[in-house]
Structures are given as structure tokens and as C-alpha cells.
From Swiss-Prot:
Protein name (record): Probable cytochrome c oxidase subunit 2
Superkingdom per UniProt: Bacteria
Pfam families: COX2
Taxonomic source organism: Streptomyces avermitilis (strain ATCC 31267 / DSM 46492 / JCM 5070 / NBRC 14893 / NCIMB 12804 / NRRL 8165 / MA-4680)
Membrane topology: Multi-pass membrane protein
Amino acid sequence: MSPNGSDRSPRRPMRRKLLQALTAGLVLATATGCTYKDFPRLGMPTPVTEEAPRILSLWQGSWAAALATGVLVWGLILWATIFHRRSRTKVEVPPQTRYNMPIEALYTVVPLIIVSVLFYFTARDESKLLDLSKKPDVTVNVVGFQWSWGFNYIENVDGSTGNAKTDKNLAAIPDRFKEAFPANAGGVYDVGTPGTRNPQTNNPGPTLWLPKGKTVRFVLTSRDVIHSFWVVPFLMKQDVIPGHTNSFQVTPNREGTFLGKCAELCGVDHSRMLFNVKVVSPERYQQHLKDLAKKGQTGYVPAGIAQTSHEKNRETNNL
């Protein structure tokens, strides 16, 4: 009985508040902008490459594990808070669990198991996603600079002359990447500015064209600071680092125009460092390269900064 003579339990208001909080959380969850088709993807974009479903599956598994862990931890916290809070009528010392070896072992082993499982799946998928053993059908040198993008299409195109393996503008790219370049690839390029817009969609930034169903290798270089190359529906991004060359491969399997952006804060106009990716048929892709050559955009724009300092010793052009 409470001091004022009422027999109303003090726990009832707490339970009522908890029920109200759970109801509000359910309303907020159902009021999001996601459709029922988006829920299995947890709000992530629809994959448009052969590699993207692996990334989506990794994220789904990680979020499911995090949610299960969170529900367990939150449940224990709420359970202890609601049902084991200090009594107003009894003063007693709660049971002590110090030096309880089974409980302490459980606290240690369970987190280790969770981390080990997450590490295994992450390492397994990362090794597959970054595997460059397959020879690419198309190679594109993506050049990041403040504050736009350049795209060097390393291809044999009618009207272009030169050799990508010896071109001075590509000197910053290590030889281990040049080995996969086509022989005598004169190449064509496209380059944007922060004010560039796609004439068809009016989306900001230059447009990178890719052929559907072909393995595309991106060789990422920077002229100035660290950028990050992110095509949103690819579900993958990679840093573009001055003095260090990164690379990954994808196989687009869906035609369309997709948005890309720099995902690394790189200066005042970082927010304008946008681009588009247009996936088309292989025939339309080849025609686009010929159109660039007719415009006089043959050869290559400077790829970036040559590797220096300890990076030069670790990964040189002679590898």
C-alpha cells in the first residue's frame, strides 16, 4: 500500500509508459518511406551488378545479428530496470555475482563468438569482392580531383592513337594494373566540372558509360586529396587516394542511369562532386566511345600523383 493509503501499485504507471513507448515506436517504424518491397533489403537500393547481392546479403546478416544482440541487451536492461528496481518498503542487498566463473565466462565467450562469426563472413566476402584474378573486359581509370571526375576509357577505339602502357598521363598507375591493359590502347576520355549536367536526365556531374554484362575494372587514382568513388546501386565504394592506386571489378547486369558521388569529405565543393553511371548494351557502349573520339577526346587525362614516400617502396611501378 502506498503512503497515501492507496493500494495502487507504483509499477503500473511504468508499465503504462512502456506500452506507450512501444506503440509509438511501432507507429514510427510503419510510417517510414519504405515500401513492403524495400523491407527485405532494409532500405538499401536494388542491386544492379552481379557482385552487389553478396554485399546486400552481408549487410542483411550483420544487421540481423546486431538487431538480435540489441534486443537481448535492451530486453535485459528493461527487465532489470522494471522488475528489479529498488523497493520502497524493503531495503536489501541484491544478490552479488562477483567471481561467478560461469557468468563471467559467458560474458567473455559470447562476444568472442559474435565477433569471430562477423569477421569470417566479412573476410570471406571481401576477398571475393576485391579479387582481380579475372581478366576484365573493360578497364576504366577513374580520376578524382577537386571537385569532379575524369574517366579514362582504356580501349582500342577507331581514331585514337597511342599506348596506355607507356602514356605519360597514366604514369601514376603501377605496372601490375597496366599488365591487363589492351595492347596499343589509345583510349578516349571524358571529364567533368562541378557544373556539368547530364543532358538527358539533367543530373549533375559527368556520365560514366558502362556495358551491360561485361566485367569492368575500375582503376582509381587521385590528383590532389582523398576522394571516395561510390555508385550507390553498386552497394560498394572505395577510396581514391593520391599516391596509392585502388581497384575493384563489377559486372553490371541492369541497364539504366544511376547516381554516383564522392563519399569522402574533400573540400568546399565536396557536395557538388557528383556523377552518373549509364549502363547500356555493349553495342551502344562502343558507339559512345567512337562518339568521344569524333569529338577529339582521344588519349587520356592525367591520372594522378605518382606514389611517393613509403608507399613508393611498398608498391612501385616496377611491381
